Curated annotation (Swiss-Prot):
This is Dickkopf-related protein 1. It comes from Mus musculus. Disulfide bonds join 86-98, 92-114, 117-131, 124-136, 130-141, 195-207, 201-216, 206-243, 226-251, 245-269. Residues 86-141 are annotated as: DKK-type Cys-1. Disruption phenotype: Triple knockout mice KREM1/KREM2/DKK1 exhibit enhanced growth of ectopic digits. Interacts (via the C-terminal Cys-rich domain) with LRP5 (via beta-propeller regions 3 and 4); the interaction, enhanced by MESD and or KREMEN, antagonizes Wnt-mediated signaling. Interacts with LRP6. Forms a ternary complex with LRP6 and KREM1. Interacts with KREM1. The gene is Dkk1.
């Protein structure tokens, strides 16, 4: 009986020893797996800029293609957009103009920057504010009518543009603003065009005040009502200023117009 018990104890001890020896590789594999799992979490705590969006600790890395940080993230231009400062329109692109942004723009501080051009029927103060193919008329961007531009002037501008492009290709390589655009802006203004002086307007037009700005208006013809200024410089008080009478005409009191008050007599353009 004791011999049987001793044999059973020996068998049990042998089996237990074998189980202990077999469990060692499993424990090693488990430890290795745990270390891999622990190390796999390290990708979530990478230092910037490899730690995902913003590079903050604990932020997950996106596995979508094209989203990894490469210095040119497609979302970076929207969040970190920097306006281009300028001093005049020529420093901006062909579809931009130089001006101060609206008061609602934050972080600009009143500095002039390049803004997107204004499309047709949008308010404007000068030609450069309107998109290509439009010009400023009566404070509104209107489509340009190129028929009044001299053909020779346009051809000369194209030749100058080709010369500038050739110089840019052979020289520093920087693009230059075309001459044609500047010539269009400096052509004689038509009726309703914004102006500063009468020399800015075409023949038969003068520069006269209209609301808050000055526009090209027709020179008065014979029989049309005119304004007789008693003092020099008094025309600056008019909101709707009239042009002067045409050549050979003078602003005089209408002969067949009789009023009781001398101040209300009607003046018209008459022959000398």
């Amino acid at each position: 009986m004791m011999v049987v018990c001793a044999a059973a104890a020996v068998r049990f001890l042998a089996v237990f020893t074998m189980m202990a020896l077999c469990s060692l590789p499993l424990l090693g594999a488990s430890a290795t797996l745990n270390s891999v799992l622990i190390n796999s979490n390290a990708i979530k705590n990478l230092p910037p800029p490899l730690g995902g969006a913003g590079g903050q600790p604990g932020s997950a890395v996106s596995v979508a293609p094209g989203v990894l940080y490469e210095g040119g993230n497609k979302y970076q231009t929207l969040d970190n957009y920097q306006p281009y400062p300028c001093a005049e329109d020529e420093e901006c692109g062909s579809d931009e103009y130089c001006s101060s942004p609206s008061r609602g723009a934050a972080g600009v501080g009143g500095v002039q920057i390049c803004l997107a051009c204004r499309k047709r029927r949008k308010r404007c103060m000068r030609h450069a504010m309107c998109c290509p193919g439009n010009y400023c008329k009566n404070g509104i961007c209107m489509p340009s009518d190129h028929s009044h531009f001299p053909r020779g002037e346009i051809e000369e501008s194209i030749i100058e543009n080709l010369g500038n492009d050739h110089n840019a290709a052979a020289g520093d390589g920087y693009p230059r603003r075309t001459t044609l655009t500047s010539k269009i802006y400096h052509t004689k203004g038509q009726e309703g065009s914004v102006c500063l002086r009468s020399s800015d307007c075409a023949a038969g037009l003068c520069c006269a005040r209209h609301f808050w700005s000055k526009i090209c208006k027709p020179v008065l013809k014979e029989g049309q009502v005119c304004t007789k200024h008693k003092r020099k410089g008094s025309h600056g008080l008019e909101i709707f200023q009239r042009c002067y009478c045409g050549e050979g005409l003078a602003c005089r009191i209408q002969k067949d117009h009789h009023q009781a008050s001398n101040s209300s007599r009607l003046h018209t353009c008459q022959r000398h």
